[in-house]
Amino acid sequence: MNRIIRTLLIFFLFNISTFSQTYIGATGGLMSSSLSGDAPEDASYSGKTGFSGGLIADFTLTEDIVLSIQPRYLQKGTSVAYDVGEYELRDSLTATFDYVSLPVMVKITSLNKRIYFSSGLDFGYLMNSTVENIVDGSTKDVNELIKNYDISATFGFGVNIPIGSPIISLELRYMQSLLNLSDISTSESGSTFPFRFRTSGFQFLTSIIFPI
């Protein structure tokens, strides 16, 4: 996965001059994510808010089609609520997954490039994963239970706001893992994570890009 990410970055950095218009800038925002799939016994998953931030490079392919490369840091996670015999489930654990992420997106622009629809793949490499016990505040490393790579499908809608030469973009994006993230070879029965699960969630992103 690291080799794929490096190859894509090198390819686009050395081929910037072949595109009709190139923009570079910064992007950041929030992600509300959770796990989908099997849940531990007597438990359910709920959403957790994380952060993302990184760089963005937009390459204009045609008048209405833009290729966007966005290397970044991305934080995913979930809360795990257990049935403790009360009317409502009680949050007991919080899981956090820190990724180096490389979304490769295609944007289709409309209305004089003021709005766009985006779709693509997000290649992620897991840097760290932890579970925090909300009750006693203890934290446990769970890297051995999670695969160190992920590929997600992404779909989004955005608005471009020109402010002279720079452009500010606001985007709402949905992200869904395509792979089972559980490391079955080392998972243990009765652990926090089951044998099959994926991450999914919504991101709200703000970007500013400059023509070069």
Give the label of every model feature segment.
Residues 20-58, 67, 211:
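Short glycine/proline- and aromatic-enriched beta-strand/turn motifs that initiate or cap beta-hairpins
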Residues 22, 47-51, 96-100, 147-153, ...:
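Residues that define the transmembrane beta-barrel architecture of outer-membrane proteins
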Residues 1-27, 202, 206-212:
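Bacterial Sec-dependent N-terminal signal peptides
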Residues 22, 30, 58-132, 161-166, ...:
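Gram-negative (and chloroplast) outer-membrane scaffold detector with strong preference
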Residues 52-56, 116, 152-154:
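A broad helix-preferring feature
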